[in-house]
Amino acid sequence: MARTIIAGNWKMNHGPRETREFVAGMKEKYQTPPAVETVICPPFVSISDLVNESPEWLKTGAQNVYFEESGAFTGEVSPKMLAELGVEYVIIGHSERRNIFAESDEEVNKKVRIALKYGIKPIICVGESDAQRNEGKTLEVVENQVKSALSEVVSDTLQNVVFAYEPVWAIGSGKAATGEDAEQVCKHIRSVISELNSSVADDIPVLYGGSVKPENLEEFMDQDNINGALVGGKSLVAETYCQLLEVARRFPGDEG
C-alpha cells in the first residue's frame, strides 16, 4: 500500500520570515506527527529556514532541480546542493515549468534520474491541457509523460518515485476535476507503472493536484488509486494546510 502524502507547492511565495512563521504554526498544531507524510516545497531562498525550523516529520521539498551536478549553469541549483541542505523531495515537470519555461519531457527525465541518484524523491507532475482533454487524449498524454519520465530509471530506485496528476486546466483556476475523473487517470498511471515494474506499482504514491482545498480533498482521498494531494495556494497558511492533513489522516496508507 502506498503512503499518504500531502505536499504543498508554495510556488513563488513565502520568504524566510514567512516560512518560519508557517513552521511555528505547524508545531503549535501538532506536538506529535500527524500520521500523514507532510511535505512543503518552498522557494529556494526559504529551504534552509524550513529545514532548520521544522520537526522531523515535516519534510522539505524543492520546486525544481537542474540535471547537471555542477558547472557553468547560471541561476540553476544542482541535486547535490539540495541533498546537502536536507531536501528530501523535489517537484519535477510541473505544468508551469513545462509551459512557461519550455521544459521538455527529455529534461524531466534527466531531472528524475539525477534526483534519484542523490536520494531525493521526485514528485513527477503529469497532466493534460484543456485542448487535449476536449480531444479525448487525456490518458494518451499522461501515459506518454509517465513513460518518458521513467525512461532508463534504475529499477531499484523506482519505489522512491511519486506521481502527481495535475490537469493543466485545473491548476489555479478554481476548477477541480471530479473524484471519478481523477481516479480514472490515476488508475491509468498506476497501470503504466505496473507495466514497467509490477512489484512496486501498488506502493508508489499517486497524488491529485489542481484547485485542491479542504472542502474537496475527501472526494479525491476516497478513491482507490489516489494517495494524497499536491496543493498550491491552500498550503500557504498553516491553519489551512492542517485542515488538509486532518482530512487526509482519515484515509490511512502505508506509514512509509
UniProtKB/Swiss-Prot annotation:
Protein EC: 5.3.1.1
A GO MF label: triose-phosphate isomerase activity
Chief location category: cytoplasm
Protein location: Cytoplasm
Gene Ontology CC entries for this record: cytosol
Record's catalysed reaction(s): D-glyceraldehyde 3-phosphate = dihydroxyacetone phosphate
Domain of life of the organism encoding this protein: Bacteria
GO biological process: gluconeogenesis; glyceraldehyde-3-phosphate biosynthetic process; glycerol catabolic process; glycolytic process
Signal peptide: none
Keyword Cytoplasm recorded: yes
Alphabetical list of InterPro entries matching this protein: Aldolase_TIM, TIM_sf, TrioseP_Isoase_bac/euk, Triosephosphate_isomerase, Triosephosphate_isomerase_AS
Pathway(s) per entry: Carbohydrate biosynthesis; gluconeogenesis; Carbohydrate degradation; glycolysis; D-glyceraldehyde 3-phosphate from glycerone phosphate: step 1/1
Active site residues according to the UniProt entry: H94 (electrophile), E166 (proton acceptor)
Residues involved in substrate binding: N9, W10, K11, G172, S211, G232, G233
Entry keyword set: Cytoplasm, Gluconeogenesis, Glycolysis, Isomerase
Subunit (UniProt): Homodimer.
Family note: Belongs to the triosephosphate isomerase family.
Entry-linked NCBIfam families: tim (TIGR00419)
Protein function: Involved in the gluconeogenesis. Catalyzes stereospecifically the conversion of dihydroxyacetone phosphate (DHAP) to D-glyceraldehyde-3-phosphate (G3P).
Descriptive protein name: Triosephosphate isomerase
Organism: Natranaerobius thermophilus (strain ATCC BAA-1301 / DSM 18059 / JW/NM-WN-LF)
Gene name as annotated: tpiA
